[in-house]
């Protein structure tokens, strides 16, 4: 008989407390995953610190799981008990504790999960789920939605990634600021698989990672001439400039983003935090909200074969913080302190 434990958040600002939790059951369109690894995202630290998106207390949060299918819902056909999977847990939308990653067993929507190839470990695979859905939300929404009150989502209306090798070039170029971050790395890979040229901005020591993800050129964010160099690279590409995805999203990066956009005649500014309140009329700015069924075809048809072929890789690589639910607090602390070109992972 399975028993469940979870790392509970009882109040904003508290450390997580490991305690018993009910073993969840899978409803229609759901699977229950027996977690072998979970990952830490910056979003999780905000949920811990200020309770953003928390709908009931105590709660279980966390977005990334990898493990084996424990149970499938009555209408689920893509998965069976024992399958190795990765999944995007969506407690931040549902508010239900059983939908949080930081537990031994988690409910995951079947349309936000994929079979993990045998050649990929759980600790590698778990870096991908949240980033996959976030990347699709950066690139493929056709109409602006609501990210939070008063802030719309971006709508770049770009096509889904393709398994074709080589993929047909789309004739478009996208700049990604923060190319070595988790979402920046995956957006680079998903965009490249859609035939979009990516020019990345990252730390000088992370150039190789951005290039592994598919960026054709990478520029140092500390270079005082980075804005002019990026503008020149876009112009030299001869491609249609789509805009910028800012995976760092600070006042300093926004200042540079807007100069780049001004010099290139405008475009989209998609960001991981609320964008500047005032932007020029030729700039369409939005904040991504990384839970959207726009990603369903990518989960259903692309993720597993793309992982098998190497079309997408589990990058940036994981750093294992520790083993057991107790280690999640340490992971959250390290995430707040800042990491570069890695994703923090806890084994269970």
Curated annotation (Swiss-Prot):
UniProt KW Membrane keyword: no
Q: Which organism is it from?
A: Emericella nidulans (strain FGSC A4 / ATCC 38163 / CBS 112.46 / NRRL 194 / M139)
Cite the record's note on assembly.
Answer: Monomer.
Q: What SUPFAM superfamilies does the record point to?
A: GroES-like, NAD(P)-binding Rossmann-fold domains
The stretch of residues making up the signal peptide is none
Q: Which UniProt keywords apply?
A: NADP, Nucleotide-binding, Oxidoreductase
- UniProt GO molecular function: mRNA 3'-UTR AU-rich region binding; NADPH binding; NADPH:quinone reductase activity
Top-level taxon of the source organism:
Eukaryota
Q: PANTHER family from the entry? A: HYPOTHETICAL OXIDOREDUCTASE (EUROFUNG), ZINC-TYPE ALCOHOL DEHYDROGENASE-LIKE PROTEIN C2E1P3.01
Give the stretches traversing the membrane.
none
For biological process, the GO terms are: secondary metabolic process
What InterPro entries does the annotation carry? ADH-like_C, ADH-like_N, GroES-like_sf, NAD(P)-bd_dom_sf, PKS_ER, Trans-enoyl_RdTase-like
Report one GO cellular component.
cytosol
Q: What does this protein do?
A: Dehydrogenase; part of the gene cluster that mediates the biosynthesis of orsellinic acid, as well as of the cathepsin K inhibitors F9775 A and F9775 B. The non-reducing polyketide synthase orsA produces orsellinic acid by condensing acetyl-CoA with 3 malonyl-CoA units. Further modifications by the decarboxylase orsB and the tyrosinase-like protein orsC lead to the production of F9775 A and F9775 B. The functions of orsD and orsE remain unclear since only orsB and orsC are required to convert orsellinic acid into F9775 A and F9775 B.
Q: What is this protein called?
A: Dehydrogenase orsE
Keyword tRNA-binding in annotation: no
Q: Which SMART domains match?
A: PKS_ER
Q: What Enzyme Commission number does this protein have?
A: 1.-.-.-
UniProt record similarity statement: Belongs to the zinc-containing alcohol dehydrogenase family.
Which residues make up the binding site for NADP(+)?
43-46, 180-183, 203-206, 272-273, 339-340
Question: Which positions are annotated as binding substrate?
Answer: 130-137, 292-296
- Give induction info: Expression is induced by an intimate physical interaction of the fungal mycelia with the bacterium Streptomyces hygroscopicus. Expression is repressed by VeA and MvlA via histone 3 acetylation by the SAGA/ADA complex.
